[in-house]
């Protein structure tokens, strides 16, 4: 018979394991491997750091889906629609602390400090994002970018920060991490409202249903202050496909997608420059190139 402790662990982790079996892009692992071109962290430490980052990322997705009232994740039902909200919250929080336990095995005096700081950043960013959405407050582009750096940058910063503790490479990688954090999130925002891959994979334009202020919608709202169409559509939390299609067309008409593509191209170019300044990194360049295909190819 299954031991009681093992059985309890299995039950606790089931929602988390459900999420793990969904197909993912493993971008964070690839990113850590790419940064190791410079940092040359011993393999045993690197594996622990990658595991910790993946654990925190996936646990935060479980919570995100609850906070966003999402229906689908990677084209599958969200964990809380199967296991219920209380179990999923508990499972995700449990995994945060399993991550902390793993960080302790790195056996470095600064590791826990770094872990704590980056998780605080992550929650501060997420809190702002939710506040704007739920109070119908449209942030400026600058406010939005600052929030993204806390939210997306939090986990990027954790992986690379932990790696640097075990590396002789002491260049300041924060500017590059910030560029990549913005690039990833704005690309994600664009994909959610514009890409075929996303509309088949996520419920169509889920960011509109969630009422989320994302990079293209923020541009549309601030560039056409005389119109409140986008705010009103976001406020409705609509699942109506026709309204969502109308909104996407409106974003196209007011130049928000073109502006988003332009911003992504600028961030991409900036990333290449920063990578070069740090001494070059073929695998990181390849990763950025691969992610850029989405917003370059579909507009040829």
UniProtKB/Swiss-Prot annotation:
Belongs to the FPP/GGPP synthase family. Binds 2 Mg(2+) ions per subunit. The lineage of its organism: Eukaryota, Metazoa, Chordata, Craniata, Vertebrata. One of its GO terms (cellular component) is nucleoplasm. Pathway: Isoprenoid biosynthesis; farnesyl diphosphate biosynthesis; farnesyl diphosphate from geranyl diphosphate and isopentenyl diphosphate: step 1/1; Isoprenoid biosynthesis; geranyl diphosphate biosynthesis; geranyl diphosphate from dimethylallyl diphosphate and isopentenyl diphosphate: step 1/1; Isoprenoid biosynthesis; geranylgeranyl diphosphate biosynthesis; geranylgeranyl diphosphate from farnesyl diphosphate and isopentenyl diphosphate: step 1/1. The modification N-acetylmethionine is found at residue 1. Mg(2+) 2 binds at residues 64, 68. It comes from the Eukaryota. The gene is Ggps1. Pfam families: polyprenyl_synt. This is Geranylgeranyl pyrophosphate synthase. It catalyses: isopentenyl diphosphate + dimethylallyl diphosphate = (2E)-geranyl diphosphate + diphosphate; isopentenyl diphosphate + (2E)-geranyl diphosphate = (2E,6E)-farnesyl diphosphate + diphosphate; isopentenyl diphosphate + (2E,6E)-farnesyl diphosphate = (2E,6E,10E)-geranylgeranyl diphosphate + diphosphate. The keyword Cytoplasm applies. Its EC number is 2.5.1.-, 2.5.1.1, 2.5.1.29, 2.5.1.10. Mg(2+) 1 binds at residues 64, 68. SUPFAM superfamilies: Terpenoid synthases. Dimethylallyl diphosphate binds at residues 73, 151-152, 185, 202, 212. The keyword Transcription regulation does not apply. Homohexamer; trimer of homodimers. CDD domains: Trans_IPPS_HT (cd00685). One of its GO terms (biological process) is geranylgeranyl diphosphate biosynthetic process.
């Amino acid at each position: 018979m299954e031991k009681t402790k093992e059985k309890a662990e299995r039950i606790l982790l089931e929602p988390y394991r459900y999420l793990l079996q969904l197909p993912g892009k493993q971008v964070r692992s690839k990113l850590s491997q790419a940064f190791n071109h410079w940092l040359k962290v011993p393999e045993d430490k690197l594996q622990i750091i990658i595991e910790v980052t993946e654990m925190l990322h996936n646990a935060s997705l479980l919570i995100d889906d609850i906070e966003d009232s999402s229906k689908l994740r990677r084209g599958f039902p969200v964990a809380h629609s199967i296991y219920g909200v209380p179990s999923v919250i508990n499972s995700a929080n449990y995994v945060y602390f399993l991550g902390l336990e793993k960080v302790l095995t790195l056996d470095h005096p600064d590791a826990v400090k770094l872990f704590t700081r980056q998780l605080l950043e992550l929650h501060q960013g997420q809190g702002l994002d939710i506040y704007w959405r739920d109070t119908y407050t449209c942030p400026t582009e600058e406010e939005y970018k600052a929030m993204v750096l806390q939210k997306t940058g939090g986990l990027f910063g954790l992986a690379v920060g932990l790696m640097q503790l075990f590396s002789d490479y002491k260049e300041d990688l924060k500017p590059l991490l910030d560029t990549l954090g913005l690039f990833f999130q704005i690309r994600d925002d664009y994909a959610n409202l514009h890409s075929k891959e996303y509309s088949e994979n996520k419920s169509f334009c889920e960011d509109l249903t969630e009422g989320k202020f994302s990079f293209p919608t923020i541009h549309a709202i601030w560039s056409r202050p005389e119109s409140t169409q986008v705010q009103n559509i976001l406020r409705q939390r609509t699942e109506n496909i026709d309204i969502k299609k109308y909104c996407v067309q409106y974003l196209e008409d007011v130049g928000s997608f073109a502006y988003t593509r332009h911003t992504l191209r600028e961030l991409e170019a900036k990333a290449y420059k920063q990578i070069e300044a740090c001494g070059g990194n073929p695998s990181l360049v390849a990763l950025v190139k691969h992610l850029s295909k989405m917003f370059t190819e579909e507009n040829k």
